């Protein structure tokens, strides 16, 4: 499944979000992320790769400052439609590629890219574009994951599909060296959480939502997760989310 097919609508992404939303040992990720990314009043803010806008904005609807000039961008028209349905006139919406942003130089005070930069084919080009549309001294926040993320999911599928290591492309460890040629004051903050899953089907739905899923029945995976829940009371999944922040010089 191509990236375009994977994100044509929000269905696959929502299946993955649901696993985290239902079974996280620390359900405050959306609020933590908002607290760390929210700009001062009156700021012009762009989110690239906004998806359906549920994690950051939907979970914090009442906290959105009406003085912000909020613009949401995604390369998928389906994602933009879902974001517009959720947020209405709280934001402007643009179908756009992070590698070629349709905005003037210095248009924004803050740019966000949450859990999406590992999908971008030419990240240096995207970083150059983000730097271009930021004002001098503007802030760029990028959430992603660190080492060990979802390692138990990888163990489940190791015999037929090595689980994607998005963190190799852009993670909490691999991201900062990529950003340093473009930005200053690069720093990392980590969010302490994990998944304690007490039902089998949400894990299988997560696996089926992947671009690598080939239609198999996942009987072995079902049995392994069910056995862990029977034995331990839950199926534990390591998660290592966090945030990389930096500034335009």
Where are these regions (language model features)?
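Conserved class I S-adenosyl-L-methionine
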Residues: 1-41, 54-58, 62, 79, 139-166
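Conserved Class I S-adenosyl-L-methionine
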Residues: 3, 20, 26, 52, ...
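Short glycine-centered segments of the SAM/dcSAM-binding site in methyltransferase folds
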Residues: 44, 137-139
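Class I SAM-dependent methyltransferase SAM/SAH-binding core
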Residues: 44-100
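A short acidic, Gly/Pro-enriched loop at the edge of an enzyme's catalytic core
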Residues: 99-110
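A short SAM/SAH-binding and catalytic strip from SAM-dependent methyltransferases
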Residues: 109-122
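A short glycine-rich, Lys/Arg-flanked "PGG" loop and its adjoining helix->strand segment in the class I
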Residues: 124-136
